[in-house]
Amino acid sequence: SKDEAKKDDSKGSVYYLNFKPEVDKQWQKIAKAYTEKTGVEVKVVTAASNQYETTLKSEIAGSNAPTLFQINGPVGYESWKDYCLDLTDTDLYKNLTDQSLAVKGEDGKAYGIPYTVETYGIIYNNAIMEKYFALDGAVVKSMDEINSYDKLKEVVEDMTAKKKDLGIDGVFASTSLKPGEDWRWQTHLANLPIYYEYKDNKVSNMDKIEFKYAENYKNILDLYMDNSVSEKGLLGSVDVATSMAEFALGQCAMVQNGNWAWSQISEVDGNTVKAEDIKFMPIYFGVDDENEGLCTGTENFWCINSQASKEDIQATKDFLTWLTTDSEGKAYMYKSTDDGGLGNAAPFTTFGEDERSSDPLAVEMYKWMESGKTSVSWNFTTFPSQTFKDDFGAALLEYANGNMSFDKVEKQVVDEWASEKG
């Protein structure tokens, strides 16, 4: 029977080193299904959380090295380029919705292909917003009118003044500044000033930055902290989970996070946010508000091991073609994790409207991607290091506690960037 499809060595085999422990079960199921269908062996090994680079280093040096692995972007490519196959002539690259998303070498060729895109912005609970619009004296009557930083600030401050009427403890969820829980500010929010500075200079990386848009960054961070569920002095003990629970329980109207957050929100005990009420708006930054979309990108790029055998390379290409063009393969890609799929928002033209995640924040992401607005690209993969980000986060906590001026925070960011990149 097809359940006993024999392994056929002449067909080559696939070995995928998977980055995401949360979808290991799904990948094992995919591997089995593909082997049963084709007779080609597919092995999936999942690295432990935060151990991917270490695992890849030891595995790639072994006699049975992964034929398929992942990198996080241009920085990861620099470390692994000796093992990245040129994918420019593959269906995988040709079928990308936006080829600028691929990781390219200095030769302009594609070496890393994004298999899912993600986005982040300001998530809001539309039910609370509608309640606000109906109040006497509300400064706007619909979300369409909130289209700039200035307008957002005006609305947020008015909502804070009316929070008793709205039944909320703050407009924004608490700004989690606990060490290790501060990535939304030292990475995601910090991406915006860097994105605009790179854009002004027409580059995708810089050895030294001016932190030209530090003031814009400070403004939005202050807006979050001054209109939040928690007092500034308490933010050092707040983690992301607490912040997301505040949103889920209806204690606030807005929270900065990404499309991956819906599962966190919906799984909170006592969640009050309905799927049809969870929406996205851009993190209006006061630079190019009329054109700014959500922050859309990925840290998930597939690479094929250029040092694998010719047969294994072909088998791996075929496996990826199946995942992105065959109806069965595509179903594994886009179906939600509850439904046995990977829940990927696959950026390929081969996926039809009905082959997209029905997750409400994924639906919002596609809506914004197709709105004609300019997506803010993910440039935080070019930040100097984890230490740089951790130090930035620690400085933000000192700033929140009133122990450090923002000028000092700004100086630290500029100095550490230069010394680490130099």
List PLM regions with ranges.
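Short, low-complexity disordered leader/linker segments with a strong preference
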Residues: 1-14, 36-37, 41, 91, ...
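Extracytoplasmic "Venus flytrap"/periplasmic binding protein-like
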Residues: 33-99, 109-112, 127-138, 246, ...
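Extracytoplasmic/periplasmic substrate-recognition and gating elements
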Residues: 37, 41, 62, 229, ...
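Hinge/lid segment of periplasmic solute-binding proteins
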Residues: 72-130, 184, 188, 277-284, ...
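Short, solvent-exposed loop/beta-turn-alpha elements that line the ligand-binding surface or hinge
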Residues: 88-102, 141-145, 176-179, 194-219, ...
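Extracytoplasmic/periplasmic solute-binding protein
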Residues: 109-115, 120, 150-206, 252
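Glycine-centered hinge/linker elements that transmit conformational signals in sensory
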Residues: 154-157, 201-237
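C-terminal capping/gating helix-and-loop segments adjacent to ligand/active sites or protein-protein/ligand interfaces
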Residues: 296, 360-418
